[in-house]
């Protein structure tokens, strides 16, 4: 392991380790690497299970600096795994405006949970971009919960939309 890329790759692989000390050390190594870790983390999004989810979560911590990951993260909104969709959605929300083109496309072209989590992101990033289909999707999840977390997320997003509309009326 001589190159920085190899060290980063090993650190990312160690994120999925079951040993807490190894995970903490891996996070420390990634923090030292800063933005250089982003491409390696994006590559880890292609993995299955916890490594993908942890890589998604770590990317979100970079905020807008991880904008290059937005397209790949948005693809995870189509995952069959709820935890993967949620990890991707939270990271996309943290990346912010650079995520919008990708999440808007997913919300427009998808149904069900993919549309829901994309719409949730949009409500948090820029509520003015919410379209009627997206609003209906959020409302449907709130009224017909599909899981434990999604109805609360729907409630948050609907609250953001209501606050945006009220604020818009004041201006």
From Swiss-Prot:
Lineage: Bacteria, Bacillati, Bacillota, Bacilli, Bacillales
Membrane-spanning residues: none
Listed name of the protein: Uncharacterized protein SkfG
Keywords: Antibiotic biosynthesis, Bacteriocin biosynthesis
Native source species: Bacillus subtilis (strain 168)
Nucleotide-binding listed as a keyword: no
GO biological process assignments: bacteriocin biosynthetic process
Regulation: induction: By Spo0A and PhoP, during nutrient starvation, especially phosphate starvation. Repressed by AbrB during normal growth when nutrients are plentiful, in association with the transcriptional repressor Abh.
Gene ablation phenotype (knockout): When the skfA-skfB-skfC-skfE-skfF-skfG-skfH operon is deleted, increased rate of spore formation; a double operon deletion (sdpA-sdpC plus skfA-skfH) makes spores even faster.
UniProt miscellaneous comment: Accelerated cannibalism by skf- cells is seen on solid media but not in liquid media.
Superkingdom in the source lineage: Bacteria
Gene3D superfamilies: Leucine-rich Repeat Variant (1.25.10.10)
Function according to Swiss-Prot or TrEMBL: Required for production of the bacteriocin SkfA.
SUPFAM superfamilies (alphabetical): ARM repeat
């Amino acid at each position: 392991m001589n190159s920085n890329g190899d060290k980063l790759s090993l650190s990312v692989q160690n994120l999925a380790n079951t040993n807490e000390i190894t995970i903490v050390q891996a996070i420390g190594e990634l923090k030292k690497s800063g933005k250089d870790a982003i491409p390696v983390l994006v590559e880890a999004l292609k993995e299955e299970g916890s490594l993908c989810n942890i890589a998604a979560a770590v990317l979100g911590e970079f905020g807008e600096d991880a904008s290059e990951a937005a397209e790949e993260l948005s693809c995870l909104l189509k995952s069959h795994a709820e935890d993967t969709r949620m990890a991707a959605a939270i990271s996309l929300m943290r990346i912010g405006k650079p995520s919008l083109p990708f999440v808007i496309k997913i919300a427009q072209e998808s149904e069900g949970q993919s549309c829901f989590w994309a719409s949730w992101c949009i409500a948090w990033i820029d509520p003015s971009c919410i379209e009627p289909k997206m609003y209906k999707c959020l409302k449907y999840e709130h009224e017909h919960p599909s899981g434990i977390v999604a109805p609360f997320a729907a409630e948050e997003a609907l609250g953001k939309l209501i606050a945006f509309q009220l604020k818009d009326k004041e201006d």
